[in-house]
């Protein structure tokens, strides 16, 4: 028999053999291919690979049908039968007994843990091939004691389609990689479990529990219907919280003022060392048994998001003088909670968080309390004054989680709240010149009660007749009452469009006209129900000649120069700087007189660089400073100084030769 031909034929048969799937799940392990020496050992009967019954049957079928290699088959079969028995292995069979299977070919093996190598396949030399005979001869071998359970067939052994598992210790890199994979798997499982629990809780919370009424009387059906309606109404209730100023509980109206701006929140002007009453109302679910109310004062930049700023501790600090003279505790707190039925605990930490917390009784839906501020905006540093101050309330559960909140967008602690509030309102509305009285109202026909003590005159000709004005009083009473009647000659603008200089000076060259006005002495700050006293007087529209008008302009120009010099000396200007304003002067000089140099950028944005530009701008816009956007607290100074400047310039233009 030709051995080379026989080997080649056997190789062809082995390559054409179908691969029988193994019973084990094998990962990508490192495998080694058998070389030519292993084939020679198999043919010579010196080496018998482990084969499954199916592989043996298929191999026997092909070998018996192939002429010339019966000797090879007999050699393999004889070697398989004479294989030494491994007595120390388990007697458990990995496959059930099949019909027609030879009992002497059944082998029992045990499964052992395998170390899987995830690396790429490595090619090994012929000398590194595994010799199973050497392993079987050494019974004390560790590899033999921990037998490899494998149902690898002959074709899988020779063709390299089945990876071989080896028992060895993991390297440090492999162990770290395996530990990392286990941690990632645990984290993924934990996240999946949390998502499932969250979805399950949402499903139970959103589930509508409906009552199915049983067959009963009409009264019981009504009870079930009422229960269903009650549960549906409870679910429709929305959770809300409001934080408002209780003006009715104020001791004085001048202590504070607040303005609710549409789409811009609440603005509050409050006086220092005065009680400001507040009320907080809310509606939350009944599942929260223990609630906490927190009041926090925050100082934040106008460019920041207020929703984020109120949740971050502010760096607001009370000034040193007020902190040293403070009697309440803690001394460094900017405000305190007084006149409240709840117990408030301050939380003033190292981060200067201005916060007070109250533990509420179960079932509480509103809280009344007063706040007293012990420092004001003018005490702060320049960097702190540029920020905005707001007051926020938070409703929290027993775990400190926020449920609802509300905020007063801007809080201003000032000396005169009503004055600053009016300036704020004037900035939003149409501004009027300060020299025009807002209380003077012209009436063409005055109808007064004749039975009244102060009855109006029946005609303009009888305005000076005091005997008709006070008919039912004595002589002394008439004299005393007549002293209260004032005849005022004021310049009132006509209905026609006036020129710009005339509107500034408050006069118009028209004919003399006589009319009456009635001025009410109303005290807006008083809550008295007394009837306001009316005063009747004379009102005139004056017509001036050219000479009189020149004197009039010169008088106001001189007065304007004196007022401008006062502004200059008040702001400590050097002698080199002139105490007057000229059209060629830069706008910075005008702002230095007012004391608001930081507003120069607003003027430059509108193209105003000199006083001449500002004069032309006023001829287009009456409310120029509101359009520019200056500080409302300094609005009166702006208009007053510009009025004096324009009167001086009008005198210069009027006296120039035509």
From Swiss-Prot:
It comes from the Eukaryota. Residues 238-428 bind DNA. The keyword Protein transport does not apply. Zn(2+) binds at residues 319, 322, 375, 379. One of its GO terms (biological process) is intrinsic apoptotic signaling pathway in response to DNA damage by p53 class mediator. GO terms for cellular component: germ cell nucleus; nucleolus; nucleoplasm; nucleus; transcription repressor complex. Phosphorylated in response to IR-induced DNA damage which is thought to be mediated by akt-1. Induction: By DNA damage. InterPro entries: CEP-1_C, p53-like_TF_DNA-bd_sf, p53/RUNT-type_TF_DNA-bd_sf, Trans_fact_CEP1_DNA-bd. GO terms for molecular function: DNA-binding transcription factor activity; protein homodimerization activity; sequence-specific DNA binding; zinc ion binding. Disulfide bonds: none annotated. Binds 1 zinc ion per subunit. Its cofactor is Zn(2+). Residues 450-477 are annotated as: Disordered. Residues 466-476 have a biased composition (Low complexity). Keywords: Activator, Apoptosis, DNA-binding, Metal-binding, Nucleus, Transcription, Transcription regulation, Tumor suppressor, Zinc. It is found in: Nucleus. Residues 535-564 are annotated as: Required for tertiary structure stability of the protein. Transcriptional activator that binds the same DNA consensus sequence as p53. Has a role in normal development to ensure proper meiotic chromosome segregation. Promotes apoptosis under conditions of cellular and genotoxic stress in response to DNA damage, hypoxia, or starvation. However, not required for DNA repair in response to UV-C or to regulate cell-cycle progression. Regulates germline apoptosis in response to DNA damage. Required for induction of ced-13 in response to DNA damage. Its pro-apoptotic activity is inhibited when bound to ape-1 in vitro. Belongs to the p53 family. Homodimer. Interacts (via C-terminus domain) with prmt-5; not methylated by prmt-5. Interacts with cbp-1 (via HAT domain); cep-1 transcriptional activity may be inhibited by interaction with methylated cbp-1. Component of a complex that contains prmt-5 and cbp-1. Interacts with ape-1; the interaction inhibits pro-apoptotic activity of cep-1. This is Transcription factor cep-1. The lineage of its organism: Eukaryota, Metazoa, Ecdysozoa, Nematoda, Chromadorea.
């Amino acid at each position: 028999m030709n051995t080379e031909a026989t080997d080649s034929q056997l190789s062809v048969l082995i390559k054409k053999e179908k691969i029988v799937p193994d019973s084990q799940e094998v990962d990508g392990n490192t495998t080694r291919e058998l070389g030519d020496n292993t084939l020679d050992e198999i043919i010579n009967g010196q080496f018998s690979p482990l084969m499954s019954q199916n592989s043996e049957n298929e191999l026997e079928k092909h070998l018996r049908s192939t002429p010339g290699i019966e000797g090879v088959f007999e050699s393999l079969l004889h070697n398989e039968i004479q294989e030494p028995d491994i007595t120390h292995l388990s007697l458990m069979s990995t496959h059930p007994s099949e019909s027609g299977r030879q009992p002497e070919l059944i082998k029992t093996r045990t499964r052992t843990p395998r170390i899987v190598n995830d690396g790429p396949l490595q090619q090994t030399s012929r000398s590194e091939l595994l010799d199973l005979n050497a392993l079987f001869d050494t019974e004390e071998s560790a590899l033999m004691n921990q037998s490899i359970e494998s149902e690898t067939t002959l074709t899988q052994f020779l063709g390299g389609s089945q990876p071989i598992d080896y028992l060895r210790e993991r390297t440090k890199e492999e162990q770290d990689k395996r530990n990392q994979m286990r941690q990632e798997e645990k984290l993924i499982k934990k996240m999946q479990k949390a998502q499932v629990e969250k979805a399950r809780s949402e499903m139970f919370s959103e589930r509508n529990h409906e009552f199915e009424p049983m067959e009963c009387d009409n009264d019981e059906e009504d009870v079930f219907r009422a229960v269903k309606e009650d549960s549906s109404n409870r679910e429709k209730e929305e959770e809300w919280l409001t934080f408002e100023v209780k003006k009715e509980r104020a001791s004085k109206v001048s202590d504070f003022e607040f303005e609710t701006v549409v789409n811009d929140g609440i603005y509050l002007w409050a006086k220092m060392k005065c009680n400001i009453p507040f009320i907080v109302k809310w509606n939350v679910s009944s599942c929260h048994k223990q609630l906490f109310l927190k009041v926090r004062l925050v100082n934040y930049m106008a460019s920041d998001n207020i929703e984020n700023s109120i949740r971050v501790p502010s760096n607001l600090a009370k000034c040193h003088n007020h902190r040293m003279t403070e009697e309440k505790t803690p001394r460094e707190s900017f405000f305190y909670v007084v006149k409240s039925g709840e117990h408030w605990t301050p939380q003033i930490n190292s981060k200067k968080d201005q916060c007070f917390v109250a533990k509420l009784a179960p079932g509480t839906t509103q809280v009344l309390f007063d706040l007293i501020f012990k420092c004001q905006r003018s005490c702060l540093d320049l960097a702190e004054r540029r920020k905005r101050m707001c007051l926020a309330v938070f409703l929290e559960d027993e775990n400190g989680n926020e449920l609802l909140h509300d905020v007063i967008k801007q809080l201003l602690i000032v000396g005169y709240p009503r004055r600053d509030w009016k300036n704020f309102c004037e900035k939003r509305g149409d501004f009027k010149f300060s020299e025009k009285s807002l209380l003077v109202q012209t009436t063409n026909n005055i109808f007064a009660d004749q039975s009244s003590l102060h009855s109006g005159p029946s005609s303009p000709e009888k305005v000076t007749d005091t005997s008709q004005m006070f008919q039912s009083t004595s002589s002394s009473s008439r004299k005393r009452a007549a002293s209260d009647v004032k005849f005022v000659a004021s310049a009132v603008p006509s209905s026609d469009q006036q020129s710009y200089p005339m509107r500034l000076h408050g006069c118009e060259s028209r004919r003399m006209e006589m009319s009456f006005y009635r001025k009410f002495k109303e005290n807006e700050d008083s809550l008295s129900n007394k009837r306001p006293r009316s005063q009747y007087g004379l009102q005139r529209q004056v017509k001036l000649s050219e000479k009189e008008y020149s004197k009039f302009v010169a008088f106001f120009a001189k007065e304007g120069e004196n007022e401008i010099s006062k502004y200059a000396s008040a702001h400590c200007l050097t002698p080199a700087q002139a105490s007057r304003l000229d059209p060629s002067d830069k706008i910075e000089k005008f702002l230095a007189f007012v004391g608001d140099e930081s507003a120069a950028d607003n003027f430059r944005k509108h193209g105003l660089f000199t006083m001449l530009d500002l004069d032309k701008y006023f001829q287009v816009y009456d409310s120029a400073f509101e359009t520019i956007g200056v500080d409302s607290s300094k609005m009166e100074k702006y208009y007053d100084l510009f009025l004096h400047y324009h009167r001086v310039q009008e005198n210069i233009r009027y006296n120039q030769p035509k």
